[in-house]
Amino acid sequence: NKMPNCLRLIVSGLSALFFLFPSLAAWAYGTDEYPSLWESDDSRLQKQLVATLSSLGLGKAVQNKKLSVAVVDITDLDRPRVAAVNGNQMLYAASLPKIAILLGAFVEIEEGSMALDSRTRESLTQMIRVSSNQEATRMLNRVGKERLLGILQSDKFHLYDPEVNGGLWVGKEYGKSAAFHRDPLHNLSHGATAMQVARFYYLLETGRLVGDNLSTEMKSMLGNPGINHKFVKGLADYPDAKIYRKSGSWRQWHADSALVETGDHKYIIVGLAEDVNGGAWLSHIIKPIHELMVPTKLAAVSH
């Protein structure tokens, strides 16, 4: 049976549109059965997030775009609930984008271009848990600087996408050397948006970064954080909370990101702040957010 001319024109037009703008296809359909976080807004959670930040005296910081926060309930992976303030605001994020180097390394490992031997595993773990700049630079160069940026911007990941104001970017070694490629939208050397970082954790948890076995390896490196500040410090009163995270700080820029698990409940939280007190802000934010995301009987402080 022949397709009617009008239908053929529509189909060919859509195909051309998605060919020219591949990220539009990803936006419309997602990469598979999981929904887009940008299409998973939860109005109740949004009101709770805004009220929480206001109660902490952070409303002005949000208004002035000095604070970005994204919270995603992924207890049901098929139905994420999203709330964010300045979620697409791209800020300097210091060491947080080392998660992008982690991804780049695991993509290379999955493709057989890099071996996950004991030295590589230790290097990646040190880069994440204690934020080693030396190991981050070592792994960045092993992956390849432009290769990493290509991975972040690829049709598979879209972790840096101009259509959503950027995202994760690593355009400089973690050391004194000059930037080799600043991000094209904001001229940042190490940047992130809260929503794109949240997507990183959602993609990881749903097995869409790399295969299951390597996803488990990646997640283990994000676990057992070696630096007790920001979100980790704020969750110290909740011993049942397991946290998988990467943070960053430099001068007045403070960032943290985490996948938090308590019982059967899981949520992602990302905070990016530009203020000398930003680290303290993040420690204060996580407590009421945790109690919002986890039922009271589970979140209660153990005695």
What is the predicted function of each stretch?
Residues Q48-N86, E261:
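A short, well-structured edge-of-sheet supersecondary motif
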Residues A28-L53, S189, R199-H303:
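Structured C-terminal helix/loop/strand segments within mature extracytoplasmic catalytic/sensor domains
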Residues M139-T206:
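Mid-domain, small-residue-enriched loop/turn segments at the edges of structured enzyme/sensor domains
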Residues S12-P22:
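Bacterial N-terminal signal peptides
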Residues L67-T75, S118-N133, N141-K145, G167-W169, ...:
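Acidic helix-start/capping segments at beta-turn-to-alpha-helix junctions
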Residues M90-M114, M127, I269:
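Active-site SXXK
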Residues V107-T125, G211-L214:
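Short, well-structured active-site flanking segments
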Residues K2-L14:
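Bacterial N-terminal signal peptides that target proteins for export
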